[in-house]
Amino acid sequence: MVESKAAMPQHIAIIMDGNNRYAKAHGLPTGGGHIAGKDNLDPLVEHCMDIGIRALTVFAFSSENWQRPANEVALLMTLLEQTVHDQLPRMLRHQISLRFIGDRDALTPHLRAIMQDAEEQTAHFTKMSLVIAISYGGQWDIVNACRQVAKQVAQGALTADAITQDDFARHLSLSDLPAVDMLIRTGGDYRISNFLLWQCAYAELFFTETLWPEFKAAELDQMIDIFIGRERRFGKTSEQVLGLSF
């Protein structure tokens, strides 16, 4: 368990990597790894709720994943539908908001409708937010925000010289949630793969060799304890963070 809740992260983001390697290691077809990964999400969501995490954002399908073999993409879309169906009763029971970010235009009308229904049914919950990134890319997110700001300028609602970081950020995904405190990537790779590029500006980064289907609450707790022990300066000196004067 987490040793202290004094400086708990409010927002954790996870790149859920390693499903295919898990399948190969266990003699399973590719789909078996993705199914195991889907099933692994449930206990971690409940654990995050139990320890007081305010928001959990998971990278389920990137904008680049459309380049994968067609049969794998079709399987992933089916599993995403199943994930929404599986998560919704749990979200309603625990009063967790279920949300989705990403380019919905690339998704089927059926999947979009399922996602919208789940969001509407859980929109009023404030205990915790589970955000699933589908057909998402950080660069897409930033370009989309640029378009929204450009429209405001074109309409005369905002001048180019007056644009602030806050003006821009409010058009990004997750603008109403705390900035990401912890970014975790499972599966052994050391990159963030175009995930929440703006929102992770000051996130503490954690990488693990553990494949996503084998990533458990105990390892998450170890990472959170390390996070709590880190000094987050946000550009300041250690003395400023500690409130010391000389």
What are the functions of these language-model segments?
Residues 1-246:
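Flexible, compositionally biased loop and terminal segments
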